[in-house]
Amino acid sequence: MTAILGLNLNHPDASAALILDGKVVAAVAEERFGQRIKHDPSFPQHAIRSVLSIGGISARELDFVAVARDASRNRAAKISYVLRHPFGGGKAALEHMHRANVDLGIGEQVALACGQSPDSIKAQLVNVEHHLSHIASSYYCSPFEGVTAGFSYDGSGDFTSAMAARCEGTRIEVLDRVHLPDSLGFFYTACCQFIGFDEYGEEYKVMGLAPYGNDSFAEVMRDLVETTSDNWFKLAKGYFGMHRGGESGKMDERNRVEMLRLYTDKWSAKLGSPRQRGQELTQRDKDIARSCQVRFEDVALHCFKRLHDLVPSERIVYAGGCALNGVMNARLLRDTPFKQAYLQPASSDDGLCIGAGLWTWHNVAGGRERFHMSHAYWGPSYSDDVTRRTAETAKMPMRELPHGMIPRAVASLLRAGLVTGWYQGRSEWGPRALGNRSILADPTRANMKELINEKIKRRESFRPFAPSIVREAVSTYFEQDVFSPFMMHVVKIRPEWRERLPSITHVDGTGRLQSIERDTNPLYYELIKCFGQLSGIPIVLNTSFNENEPIVDTPDQAMSCFLRTGLDALCLGRHLLVKPEHAALLDAACSDQAEPSAIAVDA
């Protein structure tokens, strides 16, 4: 057996994955454990212990430790940058050298995290370039074997912001790179910062805000990021912090990612004064968000069409933080020559650990067997005994049900208007709640979006909620029949259904859909089918099970969220609880049911 530990560490979204004989057996992000800080950039000690425990091996049995960073890459680009920016560029170079030195002690850190002596770890350390790890994370998890285009784009990693590749069989051939200071990801982040969304990882909020605006600043955005026929893209000099040299962010004393300002004072001459965090959003801010999103899509389409010129295939795999832009993902399938696309569920930096690990399997260990990731459930799970003990501590009205009765009982509560926490099986891999750590509700109720935003999630009112739908019904309700198991595509809801689905229809008539197959999550699939029988529409509102924190991972965390928020009900494994005022609804939901359906559930 070949055992590989893949790591993204000392970098935002620190994570770990365990790969045994070329197959992913576990993958988790550090933010779900320990301090539970979103985008936790610290050494992923808890994640390492978790994946090794799930895989049933010790650190001593590891053959390789694959790290998604290679500070030795792109030296010519770094030297050129230092020469143009002697002070700031020198600081950036020193930071990259420091990271290389940190990598020398990773084996010892893994040993300490697992409570073992440093000399007991015999694994070979393998460094894999950041964007190569991104592409590997999607290609080596995809079902594609023939010639496939590969792409990665984000803010930066190993002094690169984008990479193009040709993939075939077990080989990934890098064709081109975009080096700093040019970065489409930093362009988007700079726009986010300018309108007051200045914390790390808030780009998704601006994507949700954009449909409320008009493309009033199209000319400004074209000036900020340019494309030509003979290159990918370039940022306008003097308008971005990276052109001054140095890093784009740092870690504070509490292990939180602190972003440095990416826009310069020159923006104000074109856009006015920047919005401060907490100030009321104006129409100008919404228009900036809209123009930013439109320009991002235009530049991304330019890149994907150029990629197709380099790799004329109908298949594409891609990753990186920018790959979480669901509006762009749907456009790629509509407006480029690519007809088949694959993204794995953790397309941002948390997914780097899988890419580094699988690249090592194929290119260092010599593995030939490919792996296909068809579901996202790679985290920990907890036994019925654990969920029962947790449920009993609440002292709330509760029923313990066989698996076959759970879907209809929960569907009945949803149809009665109860907002329900749904906690089942192994936790999801990636930033999306995909049917195992979800908050569910009836999408046909007009007040549901406002209720959840105000009483449970306590977040901005403009942010949309996602629909989960059985795969075979997608074309009935959505204009684009896209298979989106990992909630990666924002598509138009058919006009005739928008008024009937008010809580999952965004202001522009779209929804970020998740299409569910019976084989990948039979319990969740059956729940949606049961809700469809009661409501006439096989769709549920799905949002992440959390309240301004990382998604819940343990039964205790799920119970805490249930008790302290406005959640009405909680399905914790086979244990269905409600707040006292809903006891009668619980009794009704659990009585007079038909024979339990046969559902194969991986406990």
Language-model segments: residues:
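Extreme N-terminal starter segment of soluble prokaryotic enzymes
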Residues: 1-5
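Flexible beta->alpha loop and helix N-cap segments adjacent to enzyme active/binding sites
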Residues: 8-29, 34-38, 81, 88-92, ...
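N-terminal phosphate-binding loop and adjacent alpha-helix
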Residues: 32-57, 300
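Short HxH-centered metal-ligating active-site micro-motif
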Residues: 43-54, 65-69, 527, 535-537
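Short beta-strand-loop/turn "lid" adjacent to the catalytic site in phosphate-handling enzymes
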Residues: 58-109, 136-137
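Adenine-nucleotide phosphate-binding core of ATP-dependent small-molecule kinases
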Residues: 277-303
